[in-house]
Amino acid sequence: MKILAISDPHGDYSKMKKIIEKAGDFDLAVVVGDITNFGPDEKVDELAEMFDKPVLAIPGNCDQRTILKALENSKAVNLHGKAEQIGKIRFIGLGGSNPTPFNTPFELSEEEIENALEGMVCSAENSGECGTIVLLTHAPPHGARDELPFGHVGSKAIQKFLDRVDLIVCGHIHEAKGTEKIGKTVVVNPGEACKGSCALINIEETANKPIEVEFMEV
């Protein structure tokens, strides 16, 4: 499965058409938050309508909580707090972020994040249908793609799922675009879509094939 991963468009979709064109023939798009820049929620429809492929989406900390209703009513699949099975790949989503110093609209406590994810990840681990488990979060795990000049700011709750899932696609920290592998888990931050950054991720359903990641700029 070829996945187009985008994050942090912040309501500026001026680069999206070029991103989609350059990505070429992909199977699925995932949008991992900050779809808007504190609203309006109606921007969701504008973004979703740009794709002619399925879209899984979660909100970011700069989205209003009311965006969940807009996502439900859009062409995109609202994956916040939910799981979706596509072939042998289980996608698990949780939007918002761990607490920030800025009191942004969609923040969750570390306890809320852990409680929301544990049941879904455990279910996927115990399912014979899941060849690959993909976690879509806006916030990165603590210690991976989360570094700012003053230290690591990722979620310690999400960190607990490293080595339990195969792939984490996250955003939030604009400066941390890139990928790294911790245990068996590949962590990908596709960069700011509003600046023309994205990532193409290829997941083979056959066992033991490595996850391939290619970053693009337009």
Q: Over which residues does each language-model region extend?
A:
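Short coil/turn segments at beta-strand junctions that form active-site/ligand-binding loops
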Residues: 1, 27, 53, 130-132
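Active-site-proximal beta-strand elements of phosphoester/diester hydrolases
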Residues: 2-10, 88-97, 134-138, 186-191, ...
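Core catalytic region of metal-dependent phosphoesterases/phosphodiesterases
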Residues: 6-86
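Divalent metal-coordination and catalytic microenvironments
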Residues: 8, 29, 34, 60, ...
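Active-site environment of divalent metal-dependent phosphoester hydrolases
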Residues: 10-15, 36-41, 61-68, 98-102, ...
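Binuclear metal-dependent phosphoesterase catalytic core
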Residues: 15, 84-87, 108, 156-164, ...
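A short helix->loop->beta-strand "cap" motif at the edges of active sites that frequently abuts
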Residues: 51-55, 131, 164-166, 184-185
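Conserved catalytic scaffold of divalent metal-dependent phosphoesterases
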Residues: 63-157
